[in-house]
Amino acid sequence: MSKTAIITGSAGGLGKGIAERLANDGFNIVLQDINEALLLETEKEFKEKGYQAVAFKSDVSKKKEQEELVQFAVTEFGQLDVMVNNAGVDAVTPILEIGEEELSKLFNINVFGTLFGIQAAANQFIKQKSKGKIINACSIAGHESYEVLGTYSATKHSVRSFTQTAAKELADKGITVNAYCPGVAKTEMWDRIDEEMVKLDDSLEIGDAFEAFSSEIKLGRYQEPSDVANLVSFLASNDSDYITGQSILTDGGLVYR
């Protein structure tokens, strides 16, 4: 029987790239996003390519909806094998201007969403009496905090912490928990970060901030979705069975830990 993977935030961007790679690896795919129009478009595209894929619209920041997402996957495909907690949002704000609304939004989605995904998946793995893999979206910002990305960095440090804690607590149940830490990729998220940095610095033009970050990458190019998807594919495979609690950098040589 084919294995089943849930990928949250997979209507576009890195999440879509991860979902497509896992589909090519032979997984049944459960696409999740809050953007219903884009989600259904991606589901249609995947089915046209012959992938076993279904879509589920939900809000990852709601514990009940994360549980419903997992139950949907089990109803559709019989069981769950891999949970990729990919959904996340960013914010570009100087430290003295960070407010309650920003904190609430980013922590609800990036941190609460990840934790609720860990819980829902782990409970299902335990119910199935099967080993399982939980893979979280961290970031270079989970290893090093960045100016005007304070809230985002704080949420990703939290994801790294929950990844370690979950790995320690769930190891005796055969469940591994790891995270992937992307760097600078040409995605809508990075486009937004670039645009917001321009607003904060009159000397910058659109693209300058992205190029400044990219110029520090030792391998000489910005990240493609496939770079992240390749790592997630490994973490979802049996080849990673002896790895847990790690937040692995995939950034082309930008942050060294």
Curated annotation (Swiss-Prot):
InterPro entries: 23BDH, NAD(P)-bd_dom_sf, Sc_DH/Rdtase_CS, SDR_fam. GO terms for molecular function: diacetyl reductase ((S)-acetoin forming) (NAD+) activity; quinone binding. CDD domains: meso-BDH-like_SDR_c. GO terms for biological process: acetoin catabolic process; fatty acid biosynthetic process. Belongs to the short-chain dehydrogenases/reductases (SDR) family. SUPFAM superfamilies: NAD(P)-binding Rossmann-fold domains. Its EC number is 1.1.1.304. It catalyses: (S)-acetoin + NAD(+) = diacetyl + NADH + H(+). Catalyzes the irreversible reduction of 2,3-butanediol to (S)-acetoin in the presence of NADH. The active site is at 152 (proton acceptor), 156. Keywords: NAD, Oxidoreductase. NAD(+) binds at residues 6-30. Substrate binds at residue 139. The gene is butA. It is an enzyme of class 1 (oxidoreductase). This is Diacetyl reductase [(S)-acetoin forming]. Pfam families: adh_short (PF00106).
